[in-house]
């Protein structure tokens, strides 16, 4: 029986490190520098909440500290939201693209830090989501 290289949750296919696409990205040099080396389960909590309390259709969603982007992809796939992800580590963005392709969902993304978020930038979004984004104490100061 072949090794399982992905799992399914909340209507999404989530790749494991053993998936050939993930391994190829690593070989190509997309090595995470700030804890974006995998999908973090904390996004499940928000997905579970959103499943019970859905976002309005076509909401403009910003996922901050998106990593592999599964939270934004969930919103795009389940609610038809327009999702955009930002992460300080540009090396994780190819993993978001891979998951978007595998899940047949469109999500835009860019490398950006919390300090680069301005009021004008945030006005373009209806909802801001982030899961497990303050893993260092000094990161909370940047958000508040």
State where each predicted segment sits.
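S-adenosylmethionine-dependent methyltransferases
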Residues: 1-144
């Amino acid at each position: 029986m072949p090794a399982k290289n992905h799992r399914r949750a909340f209507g999404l296919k989530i790749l494991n490190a053993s998936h050939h696409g993930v391994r190829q990205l690593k070989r190509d040099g997309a090595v995470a520098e700030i804890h974006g080396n995998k999908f973090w389960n904390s996004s499940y909590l928000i997905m579970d909440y959103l499943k019970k309390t859905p976002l309005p259709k076509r909401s403009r969603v910003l996922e901050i500290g998106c990593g592999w982007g599964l939270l934004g992809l969930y919103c795009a796939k389940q609610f038809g939201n327009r999702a955009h992800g930002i992460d300080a580590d540009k090396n994780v963005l190819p993993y978001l693209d891979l998951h978007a392709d595998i899940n047949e969902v469109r999500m835009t993304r860019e490398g950006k830090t919390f300090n680069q978020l301005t009021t004008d930038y945030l006005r373009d979004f209806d909802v801001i989501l982030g899961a497990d984004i303050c893993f260092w104490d000094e990161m909370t100061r940047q958000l508040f």
